Structure formats: C-alpha cells, structure tokens
Amino acid sequence: VHQDMVGDDNAAFERAVDAALAAGARVLVSTGAVSQGRYDFIPAALRARGAQVLFHKVAIRPGKPLLFARLAGGALFFGLPGNPVSAAVGQRFFVEPLLRRQLGMADEQPLWLPLHSEMRKPLGLRMHARARILLDAGGHLSAQVLPGQESFRLKTTVQANAWVVVDEQ
C-alpha cells in the first residue's frame, strides 16, 4: 500500500500518481478535486495522462461527483468526493466491492430489513443513509435511519452501525 497526501496542486498530484504506480499500485484512490469547483483538477489531469474516464458523477446521494477511470497502464483510479460522508459512501459501495472481486472474495449479501420509521428520499437518486440496526423485545430486527442525513453531518456516521440503501425509484 502506497500512501501520499497532496493539496490542490496538479504537479504534486502527478508525482503522487507516478510514485504509486512505480510502487506497483493496481488501484489508486484519491479524495477531493473531482467535482466542478475551481480546484477540481483531477478529471482533466487524468485525461492529460491518457486515462479513460469510465464514469464521472453517479445518481447517488451522498457522493454524486465520484469518478472512476482506467489509467494508461491499466491501473484503476477512483476519485472520491472530498466531503467525508460522500467519500465514505464511495469507499464502501464502489471501492470495496471492486477490491473484494479482485481478491477473489464473494460479493456481500444484503440484509433486508423493515424500516423502523418512514423515510423520504429524492426521486431518481439511490440513497445511502446512515442507520442503526434495532432489535425489539420480540427478537425482530429493523433499520432505523438516523436523523441528520445531510452529507456535512458527521455525527450520524459515528452513531451508525449500518447503511440503508434505497434504490432510485
């Protein structure tokens, strides 16, 4: 595992990518600089390196600006959003499944549970909600979506012991 930290600096990013590839990395993961802001230079930097951007932006919340690319030498690159909760969603639902497959591990199997209370979500987006699994007096499990699902709220991430994933519909 090669690890590096760079700021919003294209040249430093290039050096970090080169160092990771020289160390034999087959999957690279970065956080930040993948959206559309002034300092979001990674999509252009990857294209300049000859990378093929396979997707950039996904219909999920949180974590929409996620980027996935194949670098010129074949290594894979995940550009996760800089927001901590959005980055956690990208890691959990995109990076980890790919790594499991590359390691020959079986896909995870979801645990289907009733919701403890009603939940609203935007149409057309897959929602990844921080939740707690509850056990009632009768021995039945349910999933409680925690209040404060905005991606800037970190407290619910600490309180959660599960994710509730609700499809686009």
Regions found by a protein language model. Name each.
Residues 1-49:
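N-terminal small/polar loop signature for handling phosphorylated ligands or for N-terminal nucleophile
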Residues 45-169:
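Flexible glycine/proline-rich
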